[in-house]
Amino acid sequence: MKDRFKQKYTAGAAVAYMSRKQALKKLQLTLKDFRRLCIIKGIYPHEPAHKKQANKGSTANKVFYYRKDINFLAHEPIINKFRDYKVFLRKLNHLKAKKEEDKLKKLYENKPVYSLDTIVKERFPTFGSALRDMDDALSLCFTFAMLPHTRVLKEGMIDSCRKLTAEFMHYVIESQSLRNTFISIKGIYYQAEVHGEKITWVVPHERGLPHVTDVDFTVLVTFVEFYIAMLGFVNFKLYQDIGLFYPPQIGQVVKTDEMETEEYKEKVYSLAKPLAKRKDVEQAEDDEPLDLLGEDSDALAQKVREAKSIKTMFKGCVFYLNRECPKEALTFIIRNGGGIVGWEGGPTDLKADSKNISHHVVDRPMDKLEVNRLYVQPQWVFDCLNARRKLPTERYMPGVALPPHFSPFTSEKAGDYIPFERLEELRSMGKDVSDLEAAIPKTMDELPMRRKEVKPEKPKGIHIAVGQMHKKSKEKFHETVEKGQELKMRELMISKKHQRVYHSMKTTFKRNRNDALKLKKKAKLAKATEA
């Protein structure tokens, strides 16, 4: 009897969810401040399963949040800082109108500032959870580091992005944890293995960017603000783990005044010089196997071998970069492999005519070539890292058409189109490609040709043909028929619940096969036109 007279919309989705308008009213915040708060705290909207019930009978489109999330936000101390800042702006406008310079200066000195340190610790209770969220943080900070400063993009924020991203790249170099890289239209993709976690990020290409006017940066700025605080914590912990000074230093003893100079900062953040390590910390020789525990012995041994080959790939090699080459990207990869890098006016004081240079990286044809060094195009450095070894330089010489640059982030599956060059690359890396080769779909030209049967002309009039003995079917034919019948029987046994999934899988397989055939035909046609 009690449930019979229960009031409507007092349980279920109607209570579990709250609309954005209700949330703004509860928190007494503007939409702009509410968005900032949600981004900083990691709260995002949810789509209710029963939208009409959550909306209390209405069918209007609304943005919904969990009620427990809004109650959680109501106790956040940073809300008071948002309100203090509104009061500060009101006072600022008042004093500007009165032109009271002394009071205005004093007000600027007491400007309300909030710290995100507590929120970072709250959102990432363990260091591993922070590393797992590094992909977006690094990609966004690297993008902002390339942008010019505007009214929204403050100069201090862009400088912080440049500083923190350079510090992270220095850590990757010193720990030699870079594993893969790929050049794309969007930028250069990198993948590093830090404490057993794979971190992948993209860095835009080095080029001058104009002021971007068609993008609303107000939301992105809040993300960057949080990521700057997070990267500061992560970089400090990573530097402590391998015994580096933080902030990074080149020498053992550096004065504070010297560290603030632009010349010193240029040397530190150019990535060309190694960082100084603390004497009180003893670094283990090889910590790589510790990060790979829990895997089978073969995979573990393979990963250890790959990591070792990457660390010593460019050992003893001295690279000189021409001015047209992307210096940061090449320095990052070469120093990760144990090489030495220099360029004109660089911090390593390496001259172009030095006899110590073993590799000269150029992207333009050169008139004068030295005999005692190898000349390569920038792609050679990227391909060497992905191949885990120094590749032959003949195909990468200046003016030569470069080989295809394959992505190491895609995994080859049986039945996909895999170019011949990629198969050769996998074979050279010691991988078994026989299954991949066998599963590549064949075009009509590659199928075995059957001899055309010439039918004898029927003689006119009544004719009785001489009886002939038919040959027995081959074993392969019987096997094919039996396999086809077995497959049909198994398909009939699939339940109705899973039939749709099975048919969609079959359609996807056929589509992928057709796409692979089309790509193979295109590659064949391209080779024919080149020849």
UniProtKB/Swiss-Prot annotation:
Record InterPro entries: BRCT_dom, BRCT_dom_sf, PES
Keywords: Nucleus, Ribosome biogenesis, rRNA processing
A Pfam entry, by short name: BRCT_2
Signal peptide positions on this chain: none
CDD domains documented for this protein: BRCT_pescadillo_like (cd17709)
Gene Ontology cellular-component annotations: nucleoplasm; PeBoW complex; preribosome, large subunit precursor
Gene3D superfamilies the UniProt entry points to: BRCT domain
Lineage top rank: taxon: Eukaryota
GO biological process, one term: lipid storage
GO molecular function (one): RNA binding
Membrane-spanning ranges: none
Limits of the BRCT domain: 309-398
Compartment(s): Nucleus, Nucleolus; Nucleus, Nucleoplasm
Function: Required for maturation of ribosomal RNAs and formation of the large ribosomal subunit.
PANTHER family: PESCADILLO - RELATED (PTHR12221), PESCADILLO HOMOLOG (PTHR12221:SF6)
Family: Belongs to the pescadillo family.
Protein name: Pescadillo homolog
Organism: Caenorhabditis elegans
Taxonomy of the source species: Eukaryota, Metazoa, Ecdysozoa, Nematoda, Chromadorea
Gene name for this UniProt entry: lpd-7
